[in-house]
């Protein structure tokens, strides 16, 4: 369990091998982390009567990563828990800019 939980039951899924961030985690390990996280989330809903859960992984200090060992947060959520992610969402100025951004990302995706 997280020592400073957002809500009671907030759990961490931590790989045994050291990986500073998500980019160095092998795909099979990352997949297992999310499968385990989802199973824990379902258990939290059943055991502690939550309405939902978030799976959260921060990669890098600017993304909120404090402990430099990759880990996945399983945050149980209630309709009225008062917690809000601090999202700042703004649409792309144009469809062309959105498409250019998507193309640049697609060029760098490595799939084996």
Short names for language-model regions:
Residues 1-112:
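HIT superfamily nucleotide-processing domains
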């Amino acid at each position: 369990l997280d020592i400073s939980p957002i809500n009671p039951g907030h759990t961490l899924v931590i790989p045994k091998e050291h990986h500073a961030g998500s980019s160095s985690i092998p795909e099979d390990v990352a997949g297992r982390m999310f499968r385990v996280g989802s199973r824990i989330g379902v258990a939290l809903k059943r055991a502690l009567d939550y309405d939902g859960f978030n799976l959260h992984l921060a990669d890098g200090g600017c993304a909120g990563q404090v402990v430099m060992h990759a880990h996945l947060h399983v945050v149980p959520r209630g309709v009225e828990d008062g917690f809000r992610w601090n999202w700042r969402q703004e649409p792309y100025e144009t469809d062309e800019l959105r498409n250019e951004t998507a193309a640049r990302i697609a060029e760098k995706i490595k799939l084996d």
